[in-house]
Amino acid sequence: MDVLYSLSKTLKDARDKIVEGTLYSNVSDLIQQFNQMIITMNGNEFQTGGIGNLPIRNWNFDFGLLGTTLLNLDANYVETARNTIDYFVDFVDNVCMDEMVRESQRNGIAPQSDSLIKLSGIKFKRINFDNSSEYIENWNLQNRRQRTGFTFHKPNIFPYSASFTLNRSQPAHDNLMGTMWLNAGSEIQVAGFDYSCAINAPANTQQFEHIVQLRRVLTTATITLLPDAERFSFPRVITSADGATTWYFNPVILRPNNVEIEFLLNGQIINTYQARFGTIIARNFDTIRLSFQLMRPPNMTPAVAALFPNAQPFEHHATVGLTLRIESAVCESVLADASETMLANVTSVRQEYAIPVGPVFPPGMNWTDLITNYSPSREDNLQRVFTVASIRSMLVK
């Protein structure tokens, strides 16, 4: 993997910097590195593809070295370099695709394709010029079963979940009380509602709670907490739990009271926030508990009192909500996030070449399925294919 990264980095630099008119002295170190790559690769043969519709391709390396000059690089020099660069780039692209479509239930962190296994040999270590990528560093750590750490922006840590629970219900569905939520990606939105606006509740207050368990521990997380859940702020028709009927939800938004957020790790509270909104942080956690209250307004203007009558029918439904967004966090496991395209890169290649479903990943690389059942085998394989995708993205956008 180190060699593949170094190949890609060298080729990217060569493609960007070996251009007509450049002073040789400005790129002499790069050309020396480029020539070392050629010397190491010459005389070797590789084969890629042969899975799904990914075609089999054979690769042979027999290239001349780039020479030295006291002057600027001319058109002939650059053309010679370009021919070599283009072949190597095509090779790296195919090695990456070949690796991204393979998976293994055992030791999935290790190279799986014949070409990358061969590149892992000792004879190619002379190409290992650079090891600065976060993905490469973590791949090496994971390969040695040491602790890794990825920094994510808006990590896709929550499997998609959208549902409701009713704490009070009737066959007519005309006086409901309960909770709705939508968990997806890096965001939780939860709303508590009471058609009667807590008219008969103790102290005219309804208590709500929403608990979310993460599939992986997050650390040093920066989080945004808002006293609103905009996705539940407009009317909608909802199918009943048994699917036998539908019921009408017509929210009127109130501000939640006594908001408390707890971040827990292995059942122990690590951080707690009460009535604090905006930016908060959590040190390390695997569970989030949100609790909040709907309180009937003690004083109401006639217009507000008309919204919340003391008896049925209840045409407007008192609603309070919270939004929690994980803006950034560190995780020992690789995740899809908002700042990178690794999941899309891997999935698109597997779809384009009709790669059959293997023993590890779900059909279509369904992220909700993958993260819901994030086994050690999936973690190893995902870290490997994401690392390869990061290498490929240096050359192929």
Swiss-Prot record:
Compartment annotation: Virion
A GO MF term: host cell surface receptor binding
One GO-annotated biological process of the protein: fusion of virus membrane with host plasma membrane
Keyword Zinc in record: yes
Pfam family, one: Rota_Capsid_VP6
Free-text description of this protein's post-translational modifications in UniProt: The N-terminus is blocked. Sumoylated with SUMO1 and SUMO2. Sumoylation of viral proteins seems to have a positive role on viral replication.
Signal peptide: none
Presence of the UniProt keyword Zinc in the record: yes
Binding, Ca(2+): 266, 286
Region described as Interaction with the inner capsid protein VP2: spans on this chain: 62-73
Entry GO terms, CC: T=13 icosahedral viral capsid; viral envelope; viral intermediate capsid
Keywords assigned: Calcium, Capsid protein, Intermediate capsid protein, Metal-binding, Ubl conjugation, Virion, Zinc
Outcome reported for the amino acid change (mutating residue 70 to N): Loss of in vitro DLP assembly and transcriptase activity, and almost complete loss of interaction with VP2. Loss of in vitro DLP transcriptase activity, no effect on particle assembly
Matches recorded under InterPro entries: Capsid_hemagglutn, Rotavirus_A/C_VP6, Virus_capsid_a-hlx_vir
Quaternary context: Homotrimer. Interacts with the inner capsid protein VP2. Interacts with the outer capsid glycoprotein VP7. Interacts with the outer capsid protein VP5*.
Note: The VP6 trimer contains a zinc ion located at the center of the molecule. The zinc ion is not essential for either trimerization or transcription activity of the DLP. Zinc-depleted VP6 has an increased sensitivity to proteases.
Role, per record: Intermediate capsid protein that self assembles to form an icosahedral capsid with a T=13 symmetry, which consists of 230 trimers of VP6, with channels at each of its five-fold vertices. This capsid constitutes the middle concentric layer of the viral mature particle. The innermost VP2 capsid and the intermediate VP6 capsid remain intact following cell entry to protect the dsRNA from degradation and to prevent unfavorable antiviral responses in the host cell during all the replication cycle of the virus.
Protein name: Intermediate capsid protein VP6
Organism annotation: Rotavirus A (strain RVA/Cow/France/RF/1975/G6P6[1])
